[in-house]
Curated annotation (Swiss-Prot):
Belongs to the complex I 23 kDa subunit family. This is NAD(P)H-quinone oxidoreductase subunit I, chloroplastic. NDH shuttles electrons from NAD(P)H:plastoquinone, via FMN and iron-sulfur (Fe-S) centers, to quinones in the photosynthetic chain and possibly in a chloroplast respiratory chain. The immediate electron acceptor for the enzyme in this species is believed to be plastoquinone. Couples the redox reaction to proton translocation, and thus conserves the redox energy in a proton gradient. It comes from Synedrella nodiflora (Cinderella weed). [4Fe-4S] cluster 2 binds at C74, C104, C107, C110.
Length: 166
């Protein structure tokens, strides 16, 4: 008779322990119920990127002096600079400039070391394509400014500022 009583007591203790664990999980769920959502509904909501965000590179053809500093400081020698030496004025003339964003690691060295500031980082981060050859941008594609998502009325922008805790 005693083994039956101890089994019944063990069963009761296990039931109480299971109910306590379920209650703890339920309390955690309820504590998260009144918080704001962490995720955003992309592409209908987009984050406003920070000021120092390193997105697609913007290139100004008229400012470039074809010095190839960007190629030398790039860790993967990515920018392709084609130029021709003009003997009458003894200067380089830029013919073609291209960057393959499928290979680019967006380190920002080319922008930082450019002596004429013809390169700059934009806030554009939507570079996905179905064909990797479309990621090879020439000077015309690099010269296009990205469309601002702030002016698009169909997209709700969300400012991503860190909360300051006191």
């Amino acid at each position: 008779m005693f083994p039956m009583v101890t089994e019944f007591m063990n069963y009761g203790q296990q039931t109480v322990r299971a109910a306590r664990y379920i209650g703890q999980g339920f309390m955690i769920t309820l504590s998260h119920a009144n918080r704001l959502p962490v995720t955003i509904q992309y592409p209908y909501e987009k984050l406003i990127t920070s000021e120092r965000f390193r997105g697609r590179i913007h290139f100004e053809f008229d400012k470039c002096i074809a010095c190839e500093v960007c190629v030398r400081v790039c860790p993967i020698d990515l920018p392709v600079v084609d130029w021709k030496l003009e003997t009458d004025i003894r200067k380089k003339r830029l013919l073609n400039y291209s960057i393959d964003f499928g290979i680019c690691i967006f380190c920002g060295n080319c922008v930082e070391y450019c002596p004429t500031n013809c390169l700059s980082m934009t806030e554009e981060y939507e570079l996905s394509t179905y064909d990797r050859h479309e990621l090879n941008y020439n000077q015309i594609a690099l010269g296009r400014l990205p469309m601002s998502i702030i002016d698009d009325y169909t997209i709700r922008t969300i400012l991503n500022l860190p909360e300051i805790k006191n």
